[in-house]
């Protein structure tokens, strides 16, 4: 295990990332009992820049832990040989966009989040982005056993683009295959991603929590890979 973690750390650093704030391993084990059947979504393959009008859309329509305040969130995903493309949008009138600095707690702003893990693996990524395009990334097994990933050019590395109008906001970005292979060297865009899509805003005027796949926790907690849905790569 120590040798594996050392190799992983060296691979991350060689790609220009810093792994920050390692945490003590949590004793929590995922309880798979009494889990509802997960939602599923097909990730279509594209050639060239995605035409988002042709990409299936999922809805993060599970309203969690707070009263419904009318906010809605949606996601679209596709891929080619080099990247996974992500488009997330929110219908949200009152937007909070306070943070611009790296490593900021963007979940306190109007935040759109994508958590994913290749099937059969034990570490997942969380990508959290606010309306300013400020990105926060972690990788790990659960809420406690994880580390922050940082490099100075995150927006350029993931080609983040944000848009905003009177009805809400959206974000586009792409996750390169070679980034995922830093952690899973044999990963291919095939098979299944276990994943969830979230919308939150802990310090907005109307705090809210939404998810694509249902969450079985009684208190706010997005770090539950046992509650991920299935995203299936189409050939």
Each language-model region and where it sits:
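Structural preference for beta-rich elements and adjacent junctions enriched in aromatics
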Residues: 22-235
């Amino acid at each position: 295990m120590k040798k594996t973690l050392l190799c992983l750390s060296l691979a991350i650093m060689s790609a220009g990332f810093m792994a920050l704030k390692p945490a003590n391993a949590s004793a929590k084990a995922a309880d798979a009992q009494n889990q509802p059947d997960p939602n599923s979504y097909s990730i279509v393959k594209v050639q060239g820049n995605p035409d988002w009008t042709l990409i299936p859309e999922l809805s993060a329509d599970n309203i969690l832990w707070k009263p419904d305040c009318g906010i809605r969130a949606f996601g679209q995903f596709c891929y080619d040989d080099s990247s996974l493309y992500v488009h997330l949008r929110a219908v949200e009138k009152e937007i909070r966009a306070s943070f611009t600095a790296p490593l900021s707690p963007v979940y306190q702003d109007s935040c759109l989040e994508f958590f994913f893990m290749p099937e059969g693996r034990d570490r997942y990524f969380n990508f959290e982005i606010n309306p300013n395009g400020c990105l926060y990334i972690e990788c790990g097994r659960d809420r406690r056993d994880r580390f922050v990933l940082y490099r100075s050019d995150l927006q350029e590395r993931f080609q983040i683009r944000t848009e905003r109008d009177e009805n809400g906001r959206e974000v586009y970005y792409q996750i390169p295959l070679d980034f995922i292979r830093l952690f899973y060297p044999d990963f291919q865009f095939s098979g299944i991603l276990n994943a969830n899509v979230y919308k939150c805003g802990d310090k907005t005027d109307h705090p809210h929590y939404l998810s694509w796949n249902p969450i079985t926790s009684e208190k706010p907690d997005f770090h539950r890979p046992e509650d991920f849905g299935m995203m299936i790569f189409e050939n």
